[in-house]
Amino acid sequence: MKKVGYIAVFMAVIMVFASCFGNKTSNQVAETDSVAMEEEVLPDSTVYGVCGEGTSMHSLELVTDGGDTLTYEVMDEGSEENLVVGGLLAGDRLAVVGYVNGEKEHIASKVINLTTLQGKWMSIDKNFEIQEGGVVKSNIKAETNPWASWKIYNGQLLLNKDTFLIDELGADSLYLENKQGIFAFKRQK
């Protein structure tokens, strides 16, 4: 009778080990980089360059990083959002998102002045500096999730993995919007 008990216990132990080391499926959701997924789906259509001397109220001359000179038509009539944020000043670095219409004209749909965007910005809970080369320097040591990098992607500002629309960009104010709300920053001197 003792042998039957030992055999039953032995079989139970083998079944437990077999269930622990067998093929099992993971219920964990794999973490994915949402920005990397977007980049695979939608390539960045932003054109970078310097604002040219031929820029006027409704015409943007852009000397691209590749050396080409493109002329964009800037049509902001009827648009609810700001088409040009940060202003247009000859010599400033710009990020332009646009398209070519049926008449082979370049039409700008979003223009971001990167020279105006760079600098020190602060709000109630954030104090950071957007620097050249995609670097963000946080000036608050105790910040839980500081931004460390930035880039423009299809006319939107990416701070780390946070994506924002730039609602307004002026000499002393920056308004960023995402699904959590609108965030206001003022330029720190």
Predicted feature descriptions by range:
Residues 112-127:
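Tryptophan-anchored aromatic micro-motifs
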Residues 42-47, 53, 124-164:
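N-terminal glycine/threonine-rich, aromatic-flanked beta-hairpin/loop signature
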Residues 80-96:
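Short nucleic-acid-contacting surface segments enriched for D/E, G, S/T with interspersed K/R
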Residues 15-19:
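C-terminal motif of bacterial Sec signal peptides marking the signal peptidase cleavage site
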Residues 29-59:
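Structural detector for short beta-strands of small beta-barrel domains
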Residues 99-116:
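OB-fold/S1-family single-stranded nucleic acid-binding modules
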Residues 97-99, 165-167, 171-186:
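Short, exposed beta-strand-loop hairpins at the edges of beta-sheets
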Residues 21-24:
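Bacterial signal peptide processing site
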